[in-house]
UniProtKB/Swiss-Prot annotation:
GO molecular function, one term: oxidoreductase activity
Listed name of the protein: Putative glutaredoxin Rv3198A
Biological process (GO), any one: cell redox homeostasis
Domain Glutaredoxin: start-end pairs: 1-84
PANTHER family membership: GLUTAREDOXIN (PTHR34386), GLUTAREDOXIN-LIKE PROTEIN NRDH (PTHR34386:SF1)
Gene3D superfamilies hit by this protein: Glutaredoxin
Broad EC category: oxidoreductase
Keyword Cytoplasm found: no
UniProt xrefs under InterPro entries: GlrX_actino, Glutaredoxin, Grx-like_ET, Thioredoxin-like_sf
Alphabetic keyword roster: Oxidoreductase
Length: 84
């Protein structure tokens, strides 16, 4: 399993979030999940990195960078780049 500090900001009703989580699990990529509907600070963070929009899924990496609505392949490539 690829282990890295990876957080996915989601909502319970987001189909894109479910798709990404399923794909990451299938690729054995570990992640933490934060539902922005239940965490005001998380919702504010997501808005701050998405031009004021609370767009999910938003993924935050260990280096502080983010991707919005990425594919599992994009997440995997970013993790490889961060790992150097």
């Amino acid at each position: 399993m690829i282990t890295a500090a990876l957080t996915i900001y989601t909502t319970s009703w987001c189909g894109y979030c479910l798709r990404l989580k399923t794909a990451l699990t299938a690729n054995r990529i570990a992640y933490d999940e934060v539902d922005i509907e239940h965490n005001r600070a998380a919702a504010e963070f997501v808005g701050s990195v998405n031009g004021g929009n609370r767009t999910v899924p938003t993924v935050k990496f260990a280096d502080g960078s983010t991707l919005t609505n990425p594919s599992a392949d994009e997440v995997k490539a970013k993790l490889v780049k961060i790992a150097g």
